[in-house]
Swiss-Prot record:
The lineage of its organism: Eukaryota, Metazoa, Spiralia, Lophotrochozoa, Mollusca. It comes from Conus lividus. Pfam families: Conotoxin. Disulfide bonds join 44-58, 51-63, 57-70. Residues 18-41 form a propeptide. Residues 1-17 form the signal peptide. This is Conotoxin LvVIA. Belongs to the conotoxin O1 superfamily. Expressed by the venom duct. The presence of a 'disulfide through disulfide knot' structurally defines this protein as a knottin. The cysteine framework is VI/VII (C-C-CC-C-C).
Length: 72
């Protein structure tokens, strides 16, 4: 009976440790994805707006070097 109890407790600890490790991996992946999304959501300038190095033109628009305006 003692051997069965020890085996049961050992199995419980292994399952708990595995669950905790998976939880930390999920948190790390979520944090990585959040940082990636933050970089991808930089502000951009639409057509007719001023474009700078800090606020480039939105996708599909070009920044004219004369006047620094976004255009098609």
């Amino acid at each position: 009976v003692l051997i069965i109890a020890v085996l049961f407790l050992t199995a419980s600890e292994l399952v708990t440790a595995d669950y905790t490790r998976d939880k930390w991996q999920y948190r790390a992946a979520s944090l990585r994805d959040a940082m990636r999304n933050f970089r991808d959501t930089r502000t951009c300038s639409p057509a007719g707006e001023v474009c700078t190095s800090k606020s480039p033109c939105c996708t599909g628009f070009l920044c004219s070097h004369i006047g620094g305006m976004c255009h098609h």
